[in-house]
C-alpha cells in the first residue's frame, strides 16, 4: 500500500533512496530473489545506468522526481512525523486506522498548535512556485477504473464468441438478441439468453438479454376497434340495479353524458342496420361487434335506450307491474344477458328511436328464426346460447326483439372514423 503522502513533496533528503539496495548488495546475491522476480534485472540495469551519470545518493531521487509532486499542506506536514510515531507505538494497526487516528488528533488541536505547521506549509508552497512556475496539477488515473472498463468492454464479446460456434448457422443471430430489443428480428427464431444467472448485480443493464418476444401480444387498449370482430374472452358488465333509477317523475338515466353516444353510424362495412333500398335482414342479422359486448349488452344507458322500450313517466315503479306490451316481454335473464331484466325497464329513455319495433311487422318469423343458430354460435364468444339463457323461440317476439335490439344497439357506439 502506498503512503498517504506519496503525491506530495518531502524535505527529507538525509536518507538516500538506494540505501536498501546497497545493504542487500553487501550481504551477497540471493539466488531465490532472481528466480522469483523476472523484472529484477531490468530494475538493476536502470539503477546502474542512472548511477553511472550521477552519484548513488541522488540517482533514485532524480528518477522519482521526474513527476512533480504537489506541495504538502499543514496537515501533511504535521502527519509526516506523527504517523511514524503512531506506527512505532501501534505496529499492528492498519494504515487506514492510523489515518483515522491522525485525523481525530488534528481536529483536536487548537489554532495556536496548528500555527507552526500552517506556516511551514505556506513556506513550502512559495518554494514550490519558485521551483516550478509552470506547474499544473495532473491527477493520476486510477488503475482500478481502467480494469473495470476493460471487463465491461469485453463482456459481450466473451459471451458471444463461444456461443457463436456452438449455434452453427444461427451464430450471427446471437448478437442481435444480446442488444436487449423488445422484439426479435423478423424471420428468425429468438436465440438463447446470453445472461447467465451467476453474473451478479454488476451488469444490471444487461438484464434485457433474452427477453421474451412481445410481438405476439396485442397492445392493451381500453377501446377495441370495431374491425377486430368478436373477442375470444369478452368482458361482462352487470345489469343496472333498480335502486339506481329514480322512484317517480321522469325516468331518465343520469350517467348518459359519461358515454360517447353517436346516433350516426360510420360509413363502411360495419354499418349495422336495415338498408332502405335493399332487404332488411342482412343488416339486422350481422353479428354484434366487440364494442357492443363492452357497452351495449349489459346495462349501457344509450344502448338499452334504443332497444324499443318506452318509458312511462307518469307511472311510479311498483313491485308488481301489469304485463308489458309484447315488445317488452322478455324471459328471465341472468346478470350477463344481452337483454335487461323487466324491473329495469322504467329507467329507459323514451326519446330514442323505436326503429326495431317498426321492423318487427315486416319480418317473417319463420325466415328470421332460421338464422338464430348463426347469431348464437358458441365460437363467436357470446356469453349464452338460446337454450342456456332460457330464450323461448316460440314466444311472440321475445327472441326476435332481443336479437334486433342487440344488433341495433351497436350502432350507437360505433362512432369510430373510417380506417
UniProtKB/Swiss-Prot annotation:
Record-linked Gene3D superfamilies: High mobility group box domain (1.10.30.10)
Tissues expressing the protein: Detected in lung and testis. Detected in endothelial cells around small and large arteries in newborns and adults, but is barely detectable in veins (at protein level).
Residue ranges the UniProt entry marks as DNA-binding: 68-136
PROSITE patterns, sorted: HMG_BOX_2 (PS50118), SOX_C (PS51516)
Phenotype upon gene inactivation: Embryonic lethal due to defects in the development of the definite gut endoderm, aberrant heart looping and severe defects in vascular development and remodeling, including a lack of artery formation. Embryos die at about 10.5 dpc. Besides, mutant embryos display a severe defect in fetal hematopoiesis.
Keyword Glycosyltransferase applies: no
Region named Disordered: 1-27, 303-356
Alphabetical keyword list: Activator, DNA-binding, Nucleus, Transcription, Transcription regulation, Wnt signaling pathway
GO molecular function terms noted in the UniProt entry: beta-catenin binding; DNA binding; DNA-binding transcription activator activity, RNA polymerase II-specific; DNA-binding transcription factor activity; DNA-binding transcription factor activity, RNA polymerase II-specific; RNA polymerase II-specific DNA-binding transcription factor binding; sequence-specific DNA binding; transcription cis-regulatory region binding
Highest taxon in the source lineage: Eukaryota
Coiled coil: none
Chain span(s) of sequence motif 9aaTAD: 366-374
Every Sox C-terminal domain range: 278-418
Record Pfam families: HMG_box (PF00505), Sox17_18_mid (PF12067)
Keyword Zinc-finger: no
GO terms of biological process kind: angiogenesis; cardiac cell fate determination; cardiogenic plate morphogenesis; cell migration involved in gastrulation; cellular response to leukemia inhibitory factor; common bile duct development; embryonic foregut morphogenesis; embryonic heart tube development
Entry domain remark: The 9aaTAD motif is a transactivation domain present in a large number of yeast and animal transcription factors.
Record note on quaternary structure: Interacts with CTNNB1, LEF1 and TCF4.
Role noted for this protein: Acts as a transcription regulator that binds target promoter DNA and bends the DNA. Binds to the sequences 5'-AACAAT-'3 or 5'-AACAAAG-3'. Modulates transcriptional regulation via WNT3A. Inhibits Wnt signaling. Promotes degradation of activated CTNNB1. Plays a key role in the regulation of embryonic development. Required for normal development of the definitive gut endoderm. Required for normal looping of the embryonic heart tube. Plays an important role in embryonic and postnatal vascular development, including development of arteries.
Protein name, entry field: Transcription factor SOX-17
Annotated source species: Mus musculus
Biological classification of the source: Eukaryota, Metazoa, Chordata, Craniata, Vertebrata
Gene responsible for this protein: Sox17
Amino acid at each position: 500500500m502506498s503512503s498517504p503522502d506519496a503525491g506530495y513533496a518531502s524535505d527529507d533528503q538525509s536518507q538516500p533512496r538506494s540505501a536498501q539496495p546497497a545493504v542487500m548488495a553487501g550481504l551477497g546475491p540471493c539466488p531465490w530473489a532472481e528466480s522469483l522476480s523476472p523484472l529484477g534485472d531490468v530494475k538493476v540495469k536502470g539503477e546502474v545506468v542512472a548511477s553511472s551519470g550521477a552519484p548513488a545518493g541522488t540517482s533514485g531521487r532524480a528518477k522519482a522526481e521526474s513527476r512533480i509532486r504537489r506541495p504538502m499542506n499543514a496537515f501533511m506536514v504535521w502527519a509526516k512525523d506523527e504517523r511514524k510515531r503512531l506506527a512505532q507505538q501501534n505496529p499492528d494497526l492498519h494504515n487506514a486506522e492510523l489515518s483515522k487516528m491522525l485525523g481525530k488528533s488534528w481536529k483536536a488541536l487548537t489554532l495556536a498548535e496548528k500555527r507552526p505547521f500552517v506556516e511551514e506549509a505556506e513556506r513550502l508552497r512559495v518554494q514550490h512556485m519558485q521551483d516550478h512556475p509552470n506547474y499544473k496539477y495532473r491527477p493520476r488515473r486510477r488503475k482500478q477504473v481502467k480494469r473495470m472498463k476493460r471487463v465491461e468492454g469485453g463482456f459481450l464479446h466473451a459471451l458471444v464468441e463461444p456461443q457463436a460456434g456452438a449455434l452453427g448457422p444461427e451464430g450471427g443471430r446471437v448478437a442481435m438478441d444480446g442488444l436487449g430489443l423488445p422484439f426479435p428480428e423478423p424471420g428468425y427464431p429468438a436465440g438463447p439468453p446470453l445472461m447467465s444467472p451467476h453474473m451478479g448485480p454488476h451488469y444490471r443493464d444487461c438484464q434485457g438479454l433474452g427477453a421474451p418476444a412481445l410481438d405476439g401480444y396485442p397492445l392493451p387498449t381500453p377501446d377495441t376497434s370495431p374491425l377486430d370482430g368478436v373477442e375470444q374472452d369478452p368482458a361482462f358488465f352487470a345489469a343496472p340495479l333498480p335502486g339506481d333509477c329514480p322512484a317517480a317523475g321522469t325516468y331518465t338515466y343520469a350517467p348518459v353524458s359519461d358515454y360517447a353516444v353517436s346516433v350516426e353510424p360510420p360509413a363502411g362495412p360495419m354499418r349495422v342496420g336495415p338498408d332502405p333500398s335493399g332487404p332488411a335482414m342482412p343488416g339486422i342479422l350481422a353479428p354484434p361487434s366487440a364494442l357492443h359486448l363492452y357497452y351495449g349488452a349489459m346495462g349501457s344507458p344509450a344502448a338499452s335506450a334504443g332497444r324499443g322500450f318506452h318509458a312511462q313517466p307518469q307511472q311510479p315503479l311498483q313491485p308488481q307491474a301489469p304485463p308489458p306490451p309484447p315488445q317488452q316481454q322478455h324471459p328471465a335473464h341472468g346478470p350477463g344477458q344481452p337483454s335487461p331484466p323487466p324491473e329495469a325497464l322504467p329507467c329507459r329513455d323514451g326519446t330514442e328511436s323505436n326503429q326495431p319495433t317498426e321492423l318487427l311487422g315486416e319480418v317473417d318469423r319463420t325466415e328470421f328464426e332460421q338464422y338464430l343458430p348463426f347469431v348464437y354460435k358458441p365460437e363467436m364468444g357470446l356469453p349464452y346460447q338460446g337454450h342456456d339463457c332460457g330464450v323461448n323461440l316460440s314466444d311472440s317476439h321475445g327472441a326476435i326483439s332481443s336479437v334486433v335490439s342487440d344488433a341495433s344497439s351497436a350502432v350507437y357506439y360505433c362512432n369510430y372514423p373510417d380506417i
